[in-house]
Amino acid sequence: MAQSRVLLLLLLLPPQLHLGPVLAVRAPGFGRSGGHSLSPEENEFAEEEPVLVLSPEEPGPGPAAVSCPRDCACSQEGVVDCGGIDLREFPGDLPEHTNHLSLQNNQLEKIYPEELSRLHRLETLNLQNNRLTSRGLPEKAFEHLTNLNYLYLANNKLTLAPRFLPNALISVDFAANYLTKIYGLTFGQKPNLRSVYLHNNKLADAGLPDNMFNGSSNVEVLILSSNFLRHVPKHLPPALYKLHLKNNKLEKIPPGAFSELSSLRELYLQNNYLTDEGLDNETFWKLSSLEYLDLSSNNLSRVPAGLPRSLVLLHLEKNAIRSVDANVLTPIRSLEYLLLHSNQLREQGIHPLAFQGLKRLHTVHLYNNALERVPSGLPRRVRTLMILHNQITGIGREDFATTYFLEELNLSYNRITSPQVHRDAFRKLRLLRSLDLSGNRLHTLPPGLPRNVHVLKVKRNELAALARGALVGMAQLRELYLTSNRLRSRALGPRAWVDLAHLQLLDIAGNQLTEIPEGLPESLEYLYLQNNKISAVPANAFDSTPNLKGIFLRFNKLAVGSVVDSAFRRLKHLQVLDIEGNLEFGDISKDRGRLGKEKEEEEEEEEEEEETR
């Protein structure tokens, strides 16, 4: 029978501060996870990991049939799922032994206390995504549910929180309502309460009582994001390890606001109005367990002093920070990720000793600032350094002399010119795997490029040729991007690629090539040549590249008859051949005549350039 099979109780644990797909309910005793990993790409940590509640494979002795409301799914173990069946009234024929009830995604507007009062065993009640109002949910609606552990009321139309909730609660979700007021016993006097979700409401300071968590000192997760709070709530539970206050109206944090939160590990304060004056040296002083702090998108002009020494990830992007002083970061010896992008930093604003002693700091984001040169005193063990979108004009000999462990370096979209790159600038970067110099003002590839690099990007520069020996010794190169430059066919001789024995991807799209380059590496798998002036594909075009999987020739000058079919016969691995956007139906003779004239004009331009040189 279907009712005796394993049945998932589809209940939602609050997702990442927005309502998403229906997930399963978390079992009692959930909380902090053991191996907590941090990543700079995370906008925020997940609220909780969902856990499925299953009824047993082989149910124990019980009635052969279970009374079940129409269109609902019920099990003999007390799991009832009435989610998403367009209910407009509370089902009246629920089994009395129901312990998990799912009513999410319906049209319920009101619930009467007597409808719930006989469900004495109820442990989980999911009412999220209905049309419940505070008037339709009486204060004593949950009075008799003495075993209720999990209550989900997210995405309804509540303006006032229930005045009384059962004392056995473990997790409560009121997210995405219109709440303006919380009462003292809404969350108070609940010793088992572990997580409270109140994000995306209309809560202001006056709507939160000072004793909101009186008698509920074990709360570990509190989400108050996207409200109208101007002050940090008072008397927060000392067991908190995750506190979300982002997207509020905080301007300052008063002394002692976090003084009792020695267990706090994650603090989210982004998208507020915090200023330098709103934080003092002791604001975060007592947060001895804090690992993740997000202060992005505020009004800070400097890196705050007195940050916790336990920090692993620090978000300071999208402020107005102009300076990083000598001693504000150096005490944070556990710091691994530092995000300072989208500020107003200049090279002189970063003290040469700002990163001294930060041996664990491996990821630094400094992009979208106003740096005129590479900052001195970079962290010695940095592995990922993002300095794109600044105003850097050159790279000096000693700029990267101490960053031996650097693996990824992004210098794209600066103002770097070829003469201003010292030939020994990259000499110490023996571990570098990715180098991005796109969007600069390079006329030639800089000399002395790291030989062990796997990915080299020099897109959107002013390259007219690859100088002899520019890629010499780069046998480890896998991907080379030369997109949107001024490269011409005569400037790419077959010797240009001779050392690239492991090259798999070559992108020369958006240049001025009239022919397919010769002597390409045998290892090549993907060749991008779109948006050039290539007029023909001869029979021997790909003789040196039998391993090609993708050829992209879109938007060139190819005409009917100019592509020799036999050119592709040896390409046993070819999966994609893109030649759309060419002159497939043009007058071949006219096309060839026009292309010949273009070639003559190109040769004349090249001769003039040589005379100028």
UniProtKB/Swiss-Prot annotation:
Question: Which keywords does the record carry?
Answer: Cytoplasm, Extracellular matrix, Glycoprotein, Leucine-rich repeat, Repeat, Secreted, Signal
- Extract the signal peptide range: 1-19
UniProt KW Iron keyword? no
Show the ranges annotated as biased composition (Acidic residues): 600-613
Q: Where are the LRR repeats?
A: 97-118, 121-141, 147-168, 169-189, 192-212, 218-238, 239-260, 263-283, 289-310, 311-331, 334-357, 360-380, 381-402, 405-426, 431-452, 476-489, 502-522, 523-544, 547-568, 573-595
Per UniProt, residues of the LRRNT domain are 59-96
TM ranges are none
- One GO cellular component, as annotated: extracellular space
One GO BP annotation of this record: negative regulation of cell population proliferation
Tissue specificity as recorded in UniProt: Kidney, heart, liver, pancreas and vascular smooth muscle cells. Also detected in aortic intima (at protein level).
* Designated name of the protein: Podocan
